[in-house]
Amino acid sequence: MDNPTRKLSMVFGAGCLGGLVNSLAVWLSGMYGISAAIGVKIAPQLSAAWLYPRIVWGGIWGFLFLLPILRRNFLTQGLIFSLGPTLVQLFVVFPMKANKGIMGLDLGSLTPLAVVVFNAVWGVMAAIWLRWSKYH
């Protein structure tokens, strides 16, 4: 794939899809009480205002897939790249933007684990989409 515009649109689109699937996983986890069952107070309402920025940021994080590392093992690549948004969520968004403490611990002691799992969903979905699209 030599077309740079196609590369950019593929990784952005894959990241957006990952963001959508991640968001649905977070929402379903809250709706079905899974988050509450593990003591994590994350149960968002599914709305365009909540969903749209998550999809866009998923697309932006998708640009990590332009990096030429771990392409042979796409699932590992997705998991490794999911650490980027995970670290930002735990050390920037929760403490500085949402006022939920470092790593979101005000939301429950297992919040960091939940964030790792939900962002792994993003990374794996984006990686699978790129594999299916024959990007790699």
Region locations from a protein language model:
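Juxtamembrane/disordered regions of integral membrane proteins
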Residues: M1-H136
